[in-house]
Amino acid sequence: MSDSEKLNLDSIIGRLLEVQGSRPGKNVQLTENEIRGLCLKSREIFLSQPILLELEAPLKICGDIHGQYYDLLRLFEYGGFPPESNYLFLGDYVDRGKQSLETICLLLAYKIRYPENFFLLRGNHECASINRIYGFYDECKRRYNIKLWKTFTDCFNCLPIAAIVDEKIFCCHGGLSPDLQSMEQIRRIMRPTDVPDQGLLCDLLWSDPDKDVQGWGENDRGVSFTFGAEVVAKFLHKHDLDLICRAHQVVEDGYEFFAKRQLVTLFSAPNYCGEFDNAGAMMSVDETLMCSFQILKPADKNKGKYGQFSGLNPGGRPITPPRNSAKAKK
């Protein structure tokens, strides 16, 4: 019997959730075999599902988490722990924060437990060459061993890349690509795959919108491109979509609109790295595709954990206009 068949998921999830309400930073040490089992079983499920997911509302969409495990628990407290709500995460689960292992293990455990209600996309940090440098490798090496980090790499190489919600909301981690002409191109990407230095897969995980760019521009990250509002409008029109939902950039209010509200950036790690005073946000999409935003305020700046206000209805006017906020690049 393989590790994945022996997984006691309820026990694993129970232990991961036990630290709720504890001082942030308290670790949960699963066994190496349990973690390996989570990686192997979730990898199997990722490969059994499409690389371009076709999802149905209602669901909640979350942006970058970056190892901020206690903030992930706050998101679930606020949005409802699975299976109470359906979730789509847009990538960047690991690196930078202190508890990448707890974060990714809980997400993988929920994926295995609720495979049709819980979805994870790949971010640019779910890539060996990136998380080797920005913290995840060191955390794996310190708490377990390098072999386990390699097992995570094999799992990450099988994550789906994009999702379309009810044929109207296109979701990915980074953004658009000059190479993307048809959705079939995404469907044709074979897994497992590393993230290449350029091309369609790279762009979907790395590109950024830029209000000062017309068409396509150079990206300050040194990878991929930036794209302007007209690129967004043309893409939506061509594919009969209403909205692009992406993550990948710190935004002050946890969410930020672009291109006349045709694109929204979500970032779900409040007080990112302890260096930014940003809120985190989660976007709730109801059955009518009305989108509203649930806000996690920066924890230490506010007595109340949460704030909530509603946002856009794709193709319509928002209830609450977005506040202007400065973007910070990760």
From Swiss-Prot:
EC number from the UniProt entry: 3.1.3.16
Chain positions recorded as Mn(2+) 1 binding sites: 64, 66, 92
Native organism: Mus musculus
In-chain residues carrying the UniProt-annotated modification N6-acetyllysine: 305
Name of protein: Serine/threonine-protein phosphatase PP1-alpha catalytic subunit
Catalytic activity: O-phospho-L-seryl-[protein] + H2O = L-seryl-[protein] + phosphate; O-phospho-L-threonyl-[protein] + H2O = L-threonyl-[protein] + phosphate
Active site residues of this protein: 125 (proton donor)
GO biological process, alphabetically ordered: branching morphogenesis of an epithelial tube; cell division; circadian regulation of gene expression; entrainment of circadian clock by photoperiod; glycogen metabolic process; lung development; negative regulation of transcription elongation by RNA polymerase II; positive regulation of extrinsic apoptotic signaling pathway in absence of ligand
Modified residues (Phosphotyrosine): 306
Effect of residue 95 to N: Dominant negative, severely disrupts circadian rhythmicity of transcription
Family, as annotated: Belongs to the PPP phosphatase family. PP-1 subfamily.
Binding sites annotated in the UniProt record for Mn(2+) 2: 64, 92, 124, 173, 248
Disulfide bonds: none
Family matches, as InterPro entries: Calcineurin-like_PHP_ApaH (IPR004843), Metallo-depent_PP-like (IPR029052), PP1_catalytic_subunit (IPR050341), Ser/Thr-sp_prot-phosphatase (IPR006186), STPPase_N (IPR031675)
Function description: Protein phosphatase that associates with over 200 regulatory proteins to form highly specific holoenzymes which dephosphorylate hundreds of biological targets. Protein phosphatase 1 (PP1) is essential for cell division, transcription elongation, and participates in the regulation of glycogen metabolism, muscle contractility and protein synthesis. Involved in regulation of ionic conductances and long-term synaptic plasticity. May play an important role in dephosphorylating substrates such as the postsynaptic density-associated Ca(2+)/calmodulin dependent protein kinase II.
N-acetylserine: residues bearing it: 2
Positions where Phosphothreonine occurs in the chain: 320
A GO term, aspect molecular function: ribonucleoprotein complex binding
Residues found modified as Phosphoserine: 2, 22, 325
Pfam families linked: Metallophos, STPPase_N
Assembly and oligomerization: PP1 comprises a catalytic subunit, PPP1CA, PPP1CB or PPP1CC, which is folded into its native form by inhibitor 2 and glycogen synthetase kinase 3, and then complexed to one or several targeting or regulatory subunits. PPP1R12A, PPP1R12B and PPP1R12C mediate binding to myosin. PPP1R3A (in skeletal muscle), PPP1R3B (in liver), PPP1R3C, PPP1R3D and PPP1R3F (in brain) mediate binding to glycogen. Interacts with PPP1R9A, PPP1R9B and PPP1R7. Interacts with PPP1R15A; the interaction mediates binding to EIF2S1. Interacts with YLPM1. Forms a complex with ILF2, ILF3, YLPM1, KHDRBS1, RBMX and NCOA5.
